Amino acid sequence: MAKKHAGADANDSDYNEEPNFEDPPGFVDTISDEDLLGDMLAQRPSEADGVESVVVVDNIPKVEPVRLEKLKSVINKLFSHCGDIVNVVYPVDEEGKTKGYAFMEYKHASQAEDAVKKLNNHRLDKNHTFAVNLFTDFQKYENIPEKWEPPTIQTFKVQSDLYNFINDPDAYDQYCVAAETAPNCVQVGFWQNTLPEPSELETRERFTDTFVKWSPLGTYVVTFHKPGVAIWGGSNFQKIQKFPHPGTQFVEFSPCENYLVTYGPTPTGQKIIIWDIRTGAEKRSFVADGMSVLSMFRWSHDDKFVARMGENSIHIYETPSFYLLDLKSIKIPGIRGFSWSPTDNVIAYWVEEQNQIPARVTLMEIPKKREIRNKNLFHVADCKLHWQKSGDYLCVKVDRYSKLKKDKKELDVKFLGMFYNFEIFHMREKEIPVDSVEIRELILAFAWEPIGNKFSIIHGEPNSSNVSFYEVNKGVKPSLVKRLEKKSCTHLFWSPRGQFIVMANLTMGTFEFVDSTNDYIISASPDHFRASEVEWDPTGRYVVTGVSSWKVKEDTGFNMYTFQGRIIKRTILKNFVQFLWRPRPPTLLAEEKQKEIKKNLKKYYAVFEQKDRLRLTRASKELLEKRAQLRETFMEYRNKRIAEWKDQKSRRVMLRGHVDTDNLETEEVDEEIVEFLVKEEITLLE
């Protein structure tokens, strides 16, 4: 056995002795368990009384025993969508009649919470709207203190004027330019299109993660972030409201800017949420089905209704309750598409061919649900609905076939001998007459003149297409007024004020500016290589073409032109993302006043020309002042350096062997000429 080293017992006793962590007598701990172990205490198992998964449903119909089973089946089916129901109790009175409320127990508490969220305020019929609450809420409200304490008065915050951008005396338009400075980090600059040079209003670093979007009337600009989206406005673009919807990919404003729709997944499974812009409250949410997620909803022009297409139906919701119109959907078997009129509460939809029944385009008046016009169509493969901005006309582009080929299982359908029709509905005329225009060539693009009675189409082969312009008049068939042949364009962009149009090839980056009132003469044909977007300003005076970094990585930026195609400004901007003009709200002037101004426009010319001259004079004066300031700065710098050079003369003479080289006489200089051969040429003389 090994011997212990001397002093080993003492060392062992030192290591085996437990340290004393007890508080000294009289010690008072000032740190609570919640502050010290808050994260662990939050995970501590809590006592449950077994009612967390129970909901109370009020305002159910009061029925006799003979109708009770039917009531149970309807309500149980509705509430079973939220989870597994373990137990249901419908209290009854002495006569066996229900008392107007029920208790439902779910398998999990989360399912009960989901039922409260989805079915509270659900309308069963005209007389019964559910009030759904958790059973535990009764205990919570029982513990409300009897003594009422008034809420803390919050300081009034003066909101910035959201419409100051339309108060500019010279009516200059605004625009924003976005550029990506880092991944998921976009800088946005706001500018005013002043003359002779644009004026910068505000520049925000890290303003959005992806891109921005203006509201339809230009009041707000929306930015995208991981937690959701935010809207900004006012003179300095302050944050007006934020909407928590993680992963939002796309947003839509209602036409009157009362509501915002966000599209994107969330942890709770909600993909589409409708928000109240002024309060920030969630009005209703939907889960996307197998149909397209983006732009599922269509708004009426006055924000009174919003609609979406379902399977063989249209769901129309009333605002602000967002209940279904008349508490039921409109059943339309075979519906394939629909669209609202931009100026009236009229829906246009089309139905595909079914069982030897022809396809049909229908105009329906809302909220009466009255069909005001029908048009049957034969041999239809597809339809596209195009409303004119003023709501005067509806054009239905019909893709028709001469022959239909199906396989044995009728799963694969091929359309042969394709040709195309334009069905023009005259919305402002009695009984809404319909004219038809047939085109035998492939239709590549269609565009209405926003204010006017013309539409344009691109047709033919993609590499050698034609552009045709049609005019629609009352009582006569639409007439072809001009055809421009062999034009390699892919898109048509009308001015918001009509008359002028840009024919663009967004593959090659070529553009042609056309005046539709001057025999469709091409006034200019500029190029902007790799341009991917075209933006008209709201007044129709300027056009911007842009090369986005989403498409290419080199030579990104934008060009600005007049409505006649004359280049005004070229801007090269690294990682340029998008250019957006700020929309303008409709004018508040009555139509009679507008006509009066147009009639007397000549007398305003002198005032406008005088303003232009003053502006140019002011700009010239500012330029001269700027040049004079630059010259003064240079002369100040020059005189400073000359004085410094003179102060260093003694040092300079000493370093040069006491020879003053600043004032050398020409007699003291020896001139030496050196000649050398630079080039030799041999020329043969005949």
From Swiss-Prot:
Keyword list, A-Z: Coiled coil, Cytoplasm, Initiation factor, Protein biosynthesis, Repeat, RNA-binding, WD repeat
GO biological process: one example: regulation of translational initiation
Annotated Pfam families: eIF2A (PF08662), RRM_1 (PF00076)
Ranges: WD repeats: 203-242, 289-327, 330-365, 438-480, 526-571
Location of the protein in the cell: Cytoplasm
Role description: RNA-binding component of the eukaryotic translation initiation factor 3 (eIF-3) complex, which is involved in protein synthesis of a specialized repertoire of mRNAs and, together with other initiation factors, stimulates binding of mRNA and methionyl-tRNAi to the 40S ribosome. The eIF-3 complex specifically targets and initiates translation of a subset of mRNAs involved in cell proliferation.
HAMAP family from the UniProt entry: eIF3b (MF_03001)
Name of the molecule in the record: Eukaryotic translation initiation factor 3 subunit B
Organism: Drosophila ananassae
